[in-house]
C-alpha cells in the first residue's frame, strides 16, 4: 500500500476527545495490550497528530503519529500498527517468519507467498482469514511488515503451503516508514533459540510436518488434547517400542531411507557442492513416506552432522566445511552398493498429484526481436502504409515500406536503378539540415540504413506460452560487473535479470549454493522497480555457466563475461 509515495491531505494535532476515542479503539483492536501499554502508545499529554492521506492507488488512509513516527494507520475503519509500534510490542500480532531475501519483494509491493514462509518449531501461528498478522525475518523477532491473512492456518496447511499467505499493507523501508525517523529494526532474539542453524532447519521443517499431521487428525475428527503432551505417562509411552522395534532404531532406519532416497532420485551431480541443510530441508524431508515424520533428534545420531559423518565413514558421501561453520556435501559415490541396491518406494497417488502440481517449470529463454518505432518527424513517410506515430515495425517491414514508397512515387532513378531520388518527405525524414540542398539521390542501401537509424529503437520479448511484450527503447543486456571493495575484496554484481524473465532472488539462491558465497538482493541504483544481485568474490564463471549453458540465453544479451577469472587464478 505504501510501496510508492502517498499524497498528504492534512496534518493536524489530535483533539482531546479524539485521543480518548483512539485509546478506546486501540484497546478493542488489540486486547493483548495492557492499560499501561495503551497509555504508553497513546500518551495523554504528548504531541499526537492525525494525518489524512491518499495512497498511490487512491485509498484514503488516516495515520496517527507520535514523536514524529507513524504509530498506527486506519483503513476502512480498521486499525493497523506500524513497524515502529511493533518493534516496541513484537508480540502484538501473530507473526509469520520469512527469509531476509524476501524482504526486498515485500518492500516492492509484493504479498507474502506461502513457499517463502519458514515454519518454526512450534508450527505456524493460528490465524483466521482476514486476521491481522506481522512478518518477521529468520533470527530476529522484530516485525518488518504488517498485513492480513489471505487464508486461515488450516487452509495454509491443507494447501501444502502454496499460494498467497499474507496480503501485505505496510513494510519496513516503505514510504510510511520513511515518514518517520527511518530507524532500523532492533535485534530481538527468538523466544526459543536453538543451538545451531542445522537444528533450526530440522526443527522448522519438523514443525511444519507436525502441524500438517495435527491438522489431518482434526479433519478426521480426532482433536488432539494439548494436556496429554505434558503428561509424563504419555511421554513415556512415546518412547516405547513400536512394531517390536525401539523408536530410536526405527528413526535411524527412516533417516537412512530418506538419505538414500534423496541421493538416488533427487540430488544430481550439478547440485554439488550441496549445503547439508539444503539436503535435509529440500530433499530428505520430501522423501519421507506419507504418514511418517522424520525427526533427527529422536534418532541415535541426534544431529545431522553426526549422521553425515557416519555416511562419510561408509564412503557414500564426502563432507567438507567450505566456509566457517557451514558444511557441504562435495562428492557422492553413486556407485556405492547402498545407493545402487536401494529401491525407491512407489509414491502414493495423492503425493504424486501434489508433486506434479508443485513442480517448478524449467526456465525457457524468451524469443527477442529488435523493432523500430515511428517517431513524429517520420510519420508522413509511413502514413500511406497504414502506420502512425508510435507504431512498431520489424526491420524487414521497414525495408518493404520504403521500397513500396519509392516505387509508388516514381522515385527510382530511370538511368541508374540503384539510386533513389529524394522527394521532400524523404529529405525531411533522413537528411541532415546541411544536406537538404546538396543530396538529391541516395543508393538503396544508404537510404535504408539512414531510415533505420532515424527510427526509434524498440524490442519485443516473447516468453513461451505467453503474449508478446513490446517495449520502447534499447534492450538492456544482463550486466555483470566486478566491484572492488575495501581490503581488495571483490563483489560480482548482476543487473537486468527481470527483462529476461529471471527472478533475482532465485538466481541469488542458486549462486549462494554453487559458489558457497554470501549473496545480497537489493534495489538497482538508478533503475525503477529493478533489483540487482551481489555475490561475494569473482563469480562470473559460475554466472556464465548458469546463464549460457543452463538458461541458454544468447551471449549477445550478456555483457561482462570477459571479466571471469582466468584458469589457474582466483
Curated annotation (Swiss-Prot):
According to the UniProt record, where is the region Disordered?
178-200, 215-243
**Molecular-function annotations in GO:** RNA binding; translation initiation factor activity
**GO cellular component term of the entry, any:** cytoplasm
* Keyword annotations from UniProtKB, A to Z: Acetylation, Cytoplasm, Initiation factor, Phosphoprotein, Protein biosynthesis
**Any single GO BP term:** formation of translation preinitiation complex
Matches recorded under InterPro entries: EIF2D, eIF2D_N, eIF2D_SUI1, Pre-PUA, PUA, PUA-like_sf, PUA_eIF2d-like, SUI1
**Domain SUI1: residue ranges:** 478-551
| Modified sites of kind N-acetylmethionine | 1
Which residues are recorded as modified (Phosphoserine)? 238, 241, 348
Q: Does the keyword Signal apply?
A: no
List the subcellular locations: Cytoplasm
The chain positions of domain PUA read 93-173
Per the database record, which ranges form the SWIB/MDM2 domain?
Answer: 370-454
Q: What does this protein do?
A: Translation initiation factor that is able to deliver tRNA to the P-site of the eukaryotic ribosome in a GTP-independent manner. The binding of Met-tRNA(I) occurs after the AUG codon finds its position in the P-site of 40S ribosomes, the situation that takes place during initiation complex formation on some specific RNAs. Its activity in tRNA binding with 40S subunits does not require the presence of the aminoacyl moiety. Possesses the unique ability to deliver non-Met (elongator) tRNAs into the P-site of the 40S subunit.
Q: Which family does it belong to?
A: Belongs to the eIF2D family.
* Protein's name according to its UniProt entry: Eukaryotic translation initiation factor 2D
